[in-house]
Regions:
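N-terminal glycine-/lysine-enriched basic segments
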Residues: 1-194
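Conserved small/polar residues in nucleotide/adenosyl-binding loops
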Residues: 198-200
Length: 200
């Protein structure tokens, strides 16, 4: 199949349109009061989730005609940001999706108005550095505070029992331990602590 190449405003508009499709689906899961999303599957029944990265991964944009060509690129940019956040922190994927979309949208407006894209990039990098410093000042160190860990885990999981279990496990493994969550086969929550295992 012959490749189609798009330039300038047309290319940016197509990328932004694809990013917006993914953004609109994921943004509803934002925060502890975010709504659930039902995901249809080609096999089995639908699944219900409150997790932004799960919603993002489930979206596959079909570039069926000339109108939708390039949309997939925009959606993949947002997915890439959400996946990276998930790999680094295991949470915050919806926030990253919302921020990434709005940065793309505003950058598109500025570029269309004649601003230099490379200078915009440098400005974003400087702003990100300052934001990270400020967030560091605002952050609370909750290491060793079982009650606060349980609160954060409860909000993240949306379930008090899971939050308490995570706090119990964190207390056992300490600040340098690694927590891995897997879907169980039974009906009860359970934990297992393995001492002395390390990945090098």
């Amino acid at each position: 199949m012959a490749k189609k190449v798009f330039y300038d405003e047309d290319a940016r508009a197509r990328v932004l349109a694809g990013a917006k499709i993914l953004y609109n689906a994921v943004k509803t899961t934002m925060g502890p009061k975010g709504r659930n999303v039902v995901i249809g599957k080609s096999y089995g029944g639908p699944s219900v989730t409150h997790d932004g990265v799960t919603v993002a991964k489930s979206i596959d944009i079909d570039e069926a005609d000339d109108e939708t060509l390039g949309f997939k690129v925009g959606a993949e940019l947002i997915k890439q940001a959400a996946n990276k956040m998930n790999d680094v922190a295991g949470d915050g994927t919806t926030t990253v999706t919302v921020l990434t979309y709005h940065i793309l949208n505003e950058a598109n407006k500025l570029i269309a108005a004649g601003h230099n894209p490379m200078l915009l990039r440098k400005g974003l990098e400087r702003a990100a550095s300052e934001i990270i410093k400020e967030l560091g000042k605002l952050a609370d160190d909750i290491r060793g505070d079982k009650k606060r860990i349980a609160e954060v885990a409860t909000i993240s999981a949306g379930d008090e029992a899971i939050g308490k279990l995570i706090a119990d496990v964190m207390e056992k493994i300490g600040p340098n331990g690694v927590v891995t969550v897997e879907e169980g086969r039974g009906l009860e929550l359970e934990s297992e602590v393995e001492i002395g295992r390390a990945h090098v």
